Amino acid sequence: MKVAVVGVTGLVGTRMMEVLEERHFPVTEFIPVASERSVGKKVMFNGKEYSVVSAEDAIAAKPDLAIFSAGGGPSKELAPKFAAVGCRVVDNSSCWRMDPTKKLVVPEVNADVLTKDDYIIANPNCSTIQMLLPLAPLHRKYRIKRVVVSTYQSVTGAGNKAVAQMEAERGGAVWGEYPAKFPHPIDQNIIPHIDDFLENGYTKEEMKMVNETHKILNDNTIGVTATTARVPVIGGHSESINLEFEKEFDLADVRRIWEETPGITVQDDTAHNVYPMCRFALGHDDVFVGRLRRDFSVKSGLNFWCVSDNIRKGAATNAVQIAEVLLQKGFLPSE
């Protein structure tokens, strides 16, 4: 299969190559794509060196699959051009997520929505993916009435420049004397501000979690409210999640459901200090859940803590899993 990775030199693009290798995706011809300033750079894939090419050259090569992590602007411009030559596109930006003509997919949750007519498929927001993996099976069983989520998101979610800012600060750099991704210092700080603020007082990141939840679960009746914050960690995103169900639930059954759900690892043994932590989620594809307990302030409430590597399951791995579904359904060539 002829596969292009668009945005290949970025944090997520690099991880996409790794995940394609690790999962033995059937790539017979690899096309690394990036912006004009990166054309000619060398990348390694499956033990071979490749030169980065322009999007125009990649489109001319007519790939079977293109996995995008190049930002909303390039995706809006280029994804239709790739699709026009018969290429299936899986896009990691927010560009197509709420487009009513495009599917928004977490494979473990709603892979069944994909059809042969889908040529541009949207990869959800990283925080939404890790939240919905544990929520979806509970919603099927108990019907979720309301979700309150607070996120503690790794600097890696803001890209290489954000990581460089944190490393500079930890090295003793003085604020204002180095290129900064964030409007404030991030080291030894928490910034309750991810993406732009909207007129309703929420940020775009917070509203992504609201709107994407409704679309992926195909249920606009669920109440969702979110607060998202950036924290000075590398390993992954953490979320404090409070659920209110429409019917009474059994805590042991919740644990059983999660233990039987692919992609979820339960870490919940507080007697031995076992619970999910982002430092130990790094490099893994599962979503880790723990600190399960009833919310005694409401009749049918559940609290839990949820952690995931945002660059893997929150981005690269989920995108490759979507491609695997397309392959399994026969929408991509097997070789």
Predicted regions and their residues:
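N-terminal Rossmann-like NAD(P) cofactor-binding subdomain of oxidoreductases
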Residues: 1-186, 221-223, 256, 287-288, ...
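Charged docking surfaces used in two-component/phosphorelay signaling
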Residues: 66, 155-335
